[in-house]
Amino acid sequence: MKIAIYSTKSYDRKYIELINAKYNFDLEFFDFMLNESTVRLAEHCEVVCIFVNDNGSRKVLEKLAALGVKIVALRCAGFNNVDLKAAQELGIQVVRVPAYSPEAVAEHTIGLMMTLNRRIHRAYQRTREANFSLEGLIGFNMYGRTVGVIGTGKIGIAVMRILKGFGMNILAYDPFKNPVVEELGGQYVELDELYAKSHVITLHCPATPENYHLLNCEAFAKMKDGVMIVNTSRGSLIDTQAAIDALKQRKIGALGMDVYENERDLFFEDKSNEVIQDDIFRRLSSCHNVLLTGHQAFLTEEALTNIADVTLSNIYKLKSGKVCENIVLPS
């Protein structure tokens, strides 16, 4: 069976080929994204494997179906880039990797928090220039502060476990309550209360129509002055222009982002020799109290191994007629 694998980097290929030793699928790797222009390269493939920024729109799916593609395998947890209704109508099965390594994303989240709090990124640049001044590097003790965790799935819970060790007070919000939150000493509250009481707010929820621009100008207005916000989930959860305005007004004291709502044309590529055309992103990246990483929170050896393993296992189960627990259906 032939599989077209889009948006692959060297690290993807390494782990996928390693796991494929037990399946012997015929793999064809492409280092560019799936879109209306590149869909033709999936000809003669039964399966297309894609990542977070690939185009799974109705138009693309229609072209895939015409080529005979029967499975779209996402090697990520999110599936907002795939038109699930269209896939179902076209007879294309969609599978994903729901929990490849919650700890990987959680640990990166904490890394962003600590770097922003203790100004480590600024201190690093200073010491490289023999500037050992401590002016402007004052942080705060995490111990005793209040963190608001929005989204209490596996990643949110992994973040809570770490922050409990810091001695933080944990507030949580999620429409679907997880009993582990109380076991960790956390407390569920409504969003407005979480906004008002949290010194740090961290996002761990999916990109859905209901969550689009969850953090907007109205939400920022309800928060403490100087709040720290970290987003390692989906870029569309934050209204970026509203965040810039809140940074200028010092409502947001620090912002850590591993995702960006218009990241498709930026992330996963080397743009160092180009002029970034996204003015909003350029303004955001110019702020000294903003720390951006390029959607790397998942990037650990363990996560890459799990992603490859579950992705190929999903495909094998579907082609073998076995039950696959990771099928994604339209709501």
UniProtKB/Swiss-Prot annotation:
Keywords: NAD, Oxidoreductase. Its EC number is 1.1.1.-. The keyword Protease does not apply. InterPro entries: D-isomer_2_OHA_DH_cat_dom, D-isomer_DH_CS, D-isomer_DH_CS1, D-isomer_DH_NAD-bd, NAD(P)-bd_dom_sf. Signal peptide: none annotated. It is an enzyme of class 1 (oxidoreductase). It holds the Pfam family 2-Hacid_dh_C. It comes from the Bacteria. CDD domains: LDH_like_2 (cd12183). PROSITE patterns: D_2_HYDROXYACID_DH_1, D_2_HYDROXYACID_DH_2, D_2_HYDROXYACID_DH_3. NAD(+) binds at residues 154-155, 232-234, 258, 295-298. The active site is at 234, 263, 295 (proton donor). One of its GO terms (molecular function) is NAD binding. Belongs to the D-isomer specific 2-hydroxyacid dehydrogenase family. This is 2-hydroxyacid dehydrogenase homolog. The lineage of its organism: Bacteria, Pseudomonadati, Pseudomonadota, Gammaproteobacteria, Pasteurellales.
